[in-house]
């Protein structure tokens, strides 16, 4: 696939990090939808890196979630600023993309999985996964990136997409990190009772059959989107079919609104960072 890139803005050298560079690229993507329809449009991809590196750096593709309240326009490429900084400080080039339908990327809601009682998670994650794969291809083409040393990570819907990417065995990816990944949650109207968790459990089992890279799953004990027990069942289904992974039960998150522990990625970084450090070290990414 050709990758014509349009540089929207070459950001700045931060005073606190003299060599920190941020830029926003547009990436033309093409996704196959239901009935073999094709949708083509540009994605906004934020690229965050340390320009002082003396050799190509590993990369991390970071995926965002999906709003329970339908506020798709609120997403930003730098929405996880503190978490992006952590990964850049670990030596990664971070690519944080906005999928079709979200934030500045705009467009239709191509990931819609249907009604709550019959959610088609396989379709929805396949559409998101096609976009992840094309962002990965972009990453591996950039001159300052080591194309064989990549990680895919995400939060909420993006966490599930990280496991979907692991199941694709995409070139250059050697690990996946799932922060509170899942789908169909509504912490206000159905706290701890997401739509059709059984269907998502079966899908995670399917992912486990083909995924070959190590994975890390992190969930807070008071995640109001999924509850405490359902994520354990999802992880068990994945590993029972051959998926490699480690599950970390993070502590409860307080004063975080209706979602509770679903905000662990942004609210208790000190709790999860030690586990992510260990995982990255184990798969060959030592601290610079």
Question: In which residue ranges do the predicted regions lie?
Answer:
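Glycine-rich nucleophile elbow surrounding the catalytic serine of serine-hydrolase chemistry
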Residues: 154-164
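The conserved beta1-alpha1 loop
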Residues: 63-65, 219
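Short substrate-entry loop that stabilizes the transition state in hydrolases
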Residues: 54-57, 65-104, 225-227
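C-terminal catalytic histidine-bearing segment of alpha/beta-hydrolase fold enzymes
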Residues: 241-288
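Alpha/beta-hydrolase active-site loop
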Residues: 114-143
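N-terminal cap/lid segment of alpha/beta-hydrolase-fold proteins
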Residues: 19-54
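The feature captures the conserved acid-bearing segment of alpha/beta-hydrolase catalytic domains
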Residues: 175, 181-241
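Alpha/beta-hydrolase fold nucleophile elbow
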Residues: 144-156
């Amino acid at each position: 696939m050709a990758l014509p890139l349009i540089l929207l803005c070459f950001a700045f050298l931060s005073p606190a990090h003299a060599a920190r560079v941020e830029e926003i690229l547009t990436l033309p993507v093409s996704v196959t939808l239901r009935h073999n329809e094709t949708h083509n449009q540009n994605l906004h991809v934020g690229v965050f890196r340390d320009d002082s590196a003396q050799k190509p750096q590993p990369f991390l593709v970071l995926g965002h979630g999906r709003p329970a309240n339908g506020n798709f326009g609120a997403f930003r490429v730098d929405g996880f600023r503190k978490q992006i900084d952590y990964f850049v400080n670990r030596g990664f080039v971070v690519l944080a993309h906005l999928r079709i339908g979200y934030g500045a990327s705009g467009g239709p809601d191509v990931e819609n999985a249907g009604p709550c009682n019959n959610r088609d998670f396989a379709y929805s994650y396949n559409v998101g996964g096609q976009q992840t794969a094309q962002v990965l291809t972009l990453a591996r083409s950039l001159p300052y990136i080591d194309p064989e040393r990549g990680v895919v990570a995400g939060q909420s819907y993006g966490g599930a997409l990280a496991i979907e990417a692991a199941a694709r065995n995409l070139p250059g990816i050697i690990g996946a990190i799932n922060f509170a990944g899942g789908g169909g949650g509504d912490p206000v109207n159905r706290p701890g009772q997401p739509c059709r968790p059984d269907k998502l459990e079966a899908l995670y089992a399917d992912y486990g059959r083909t995924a070959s890279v190590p994975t890390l799953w992190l969930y807070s004990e008071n995640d109001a989107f999924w509850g405490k027990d359902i994520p354990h069942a999802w992880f068990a289904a994945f590993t029972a079919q051959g998926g490699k992974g480690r599950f970390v039960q993070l502590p409860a998150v307080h004063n975080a609104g209706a979602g509770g522990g679903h905000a662990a990625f942004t609210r208790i970084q000190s709790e999860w960072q030690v586990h992510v450090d260990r995982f990255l070290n184990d798969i060959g990414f030592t601290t610079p």
